[in-house]
A protein has these predicted regions:
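Domain-length accessory/inserted modules outside core catalytic folds
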Residues: 1-103, 107-180
Length: 180
């Protein structure tokens, strides 16, 4: 998976409407609605860049790679989805805000898919969605300590598993037929 700082650097140079966490959350929400790469770019960038520019093309290649990696991660049975967030070398409040931004982006991307996506969710799937809504409202008011770090890690894992669960409800994986 691409590094948060690398993706953030690319988005800063294009320029983007969001940070890397929110952009990745939007991407995952859009993927649940089977949206494509260009739709994600429209939601993420201030304007569509000139693809003929070599520097722009290199930057777009990074975003294309993130799109493809995320698509594969969401559509495999190994539950390998990684949530793109600031790494541990970033300040705790920055990581917490990154998680909230990721959830905001996910909700935005999922909302673009329309009401039919939400209707496909079971009661448990809607509870997952409600949890992400609550997490999207987290702020800077937590001091970092061992307990908050543990809670943060648990929230990240809950977000990851919730998205995988909702994706499975909206887009059930098609298992290959078993040969007897």
């Amino acid at each position: 998976m691409l590094d948060f700082d690398d993706v953030q650097n690319v988005l800063d140079k294009l320029p983007a409407l969001t940070d890397a966490s929110e952009a990745h959350g939007t991407l995952c929400g859009l993927l649940l609605g089977r949206q494509d790469y260009n739709r994600w770019l429209e939601c993420t960038l201030e304007q569509m860049p000139d693809k003929g520019d070599l520097l722009v093309a290199e930057r777009l290649q990074v975003l294309q790679e993130l799109f493809e990696q995320s698509k594969v991660q969401l559509n495999t049975e190994d539950m390998s989805l990684e949530v793109l967030l600031p790494e541990e070398d970033h300040a705790f409040d920055e990581r917490l805000v990154g998680l909230a931004s990721w959830c905001q982006g996910f909700l935005y991307g999922l909302g673009i898919g329309g009401e039919s996506l939400l209707e496909a969710l079971s009661e448990q799937g809607r509870e997952c969605l409600d949890d992400l809504l609550q997490i999207s409202q987290l702020g800077h008011d937590e001091e970092e300590n061992d307990e908050t770090e543990t809670v943060y890690s648990e929230l990240v894992e809950h977000v990851r598993l919730s998205v995988i669960y909702m994706n499975e409800e909206i887009n059930p994986l098609i298992s290959s037929p078993q040969v007897h």
